[in-house]
């Protein structure tokens, strides 16, 4: 396991590459932002939105997928304030929404938008979450489908071809899908987690009826092509600055958590549902890094902390089994602690963790694994 010389990302991060100086592509992407002609990018954005803007006001200008989080709150506010767009906000609601998530959703609506909320069948959602956990190591799998598929379905149903997303996570965090346009190819590769391993249509093998999977399937190619559905990343046309945007949305009433989220030291991200901490924990066991590493890298890029300070934060906050909803999590998915450990063992990269003399993964008194490699 090797680590970037500039930030803290390891070479186990999917899609990450290193140059000959040992600097990762995420760091290089961030530095490249300073070389981009953002005025030219802005003009390109204007050309795109003018192509799709409703001329007679009879329809919405675009769809903005939202969660009530800091990014989608900023997206909606920005395109309305700066360009006079009339967006339709679309939210795929996770089954395990928490009060703070609902509070931020209501705050977003109060800013002044038309808003559609899609609530999936909670019984089917739970089954899909259990499949995601046991087969893919991702309990938030159905959400990662629905947040892409439902806005695309609404776009087709309401005949609104332009969908405006926020940052391109593949570009922002050093992945391979760095284009400006979110098209079907990008969606199939990056926008439906594990579609290559588990196409949603194959979930019927687990006893779920195909008609119950409609929210998690994209419109047909013909429907998408006929309407000309086009998804773009706002972050491809405007310099993305998380901290400036956070300041703006807090001024609009966005609320952060009163304490850091489990697995990190920050309190401003992934505030809407219960099990994101578990998602981040499984990321850690698979790749040897989690949400604290993500946040530390961002802080390093923006010169808010040094690499050494980031190392200490990661060591303090990362790699522990989430406890806030753990008992509820086990009960929800009908698991014993032993069964949970078995799932962890199934998806953990055993080469990254300490083992006992019998070759099994070593656990401390709280059941936590011990990572062998550190930046």
Predicted feature residues:
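Long, structured ligand/cofactor-binding scaffold of large enzymes
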Residues: 74-76
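Short, glycine-rich nucleotide/cofactor-binding loops
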Residues: 62-72
């Amino acid at each position: 396991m090797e680590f970037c010389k500039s930030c803290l990302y390891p070479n186990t991060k999917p899609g990450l590459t290193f140059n000959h100086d040992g600097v990762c592509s995420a760091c290089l992407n961030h530095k490249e932002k300073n070389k981009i002609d953002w005025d030219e990018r802005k003009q390109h954005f204007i050309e795109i939105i003018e192509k799709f803007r409703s001329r007679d006001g009879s329809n919405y200008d675009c769809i903005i997928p939202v969660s009530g989080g800091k990014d989608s709150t900023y997206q909606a506010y920005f395109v309305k304030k700066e360009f006079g767009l009339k967006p339709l906000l679309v939210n795929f609601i996770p089954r395990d929404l928490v009060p703070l998530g609902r509070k931020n959703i209501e705050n977003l609506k109060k800013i002044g938008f038309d808003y559609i909320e899609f609530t999936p069948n909670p019984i089917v959602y739970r089954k899909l979450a259990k499949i995601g956990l046991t087969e893919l190591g991702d309990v938030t799998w159905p959400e990662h489908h629905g947040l892409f598929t439902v806005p695309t379905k609404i776009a087709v149903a309401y005949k609104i071809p332009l969908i405006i997303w926020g940052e391109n996570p593949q570009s922002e965090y050093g992945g391979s899908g760095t284009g400006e346009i979110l098209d079907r190819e990008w969606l199939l590769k990056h926008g439906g987690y594990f579609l290559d391993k588990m196409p949603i249509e194959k979930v019927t093998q687990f006893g779920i009826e195909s008609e119950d999977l409609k929210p998690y399937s994209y419109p047909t190619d013909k429907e998408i092509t006929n309407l000309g559905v086009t998804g773009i990343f706002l972050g491809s046309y405007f310099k993305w600055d998380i901290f400036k945007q956070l300041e703006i949305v807090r001024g609009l009433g966005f609320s952060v958590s009163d304490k850091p989220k489990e697995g990190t030291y920050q309190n401003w991200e992934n505030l809407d549902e219960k099990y994101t901490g578990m998602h981040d924990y499984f990321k850690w066991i698979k790749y040897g890094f989690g949400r604290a590493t993500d946040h530390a890298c961002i802080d390093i890029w923006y010169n808010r902390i040094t690499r050494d300070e980031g190392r200490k934060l990661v060591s303090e906050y990362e790699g522990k089994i989430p406890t806030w909803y753990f008992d509820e999590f086990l009960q929800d998915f009908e698991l014993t602690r032993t069964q949970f450990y078995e799932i962890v063992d199934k998806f953990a990269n055993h080469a990254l963790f300490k083992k006992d003399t019998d070759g099994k993964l070593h656990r401390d008194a709280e059941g936590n694994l011990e990572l062998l490699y550190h930046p």
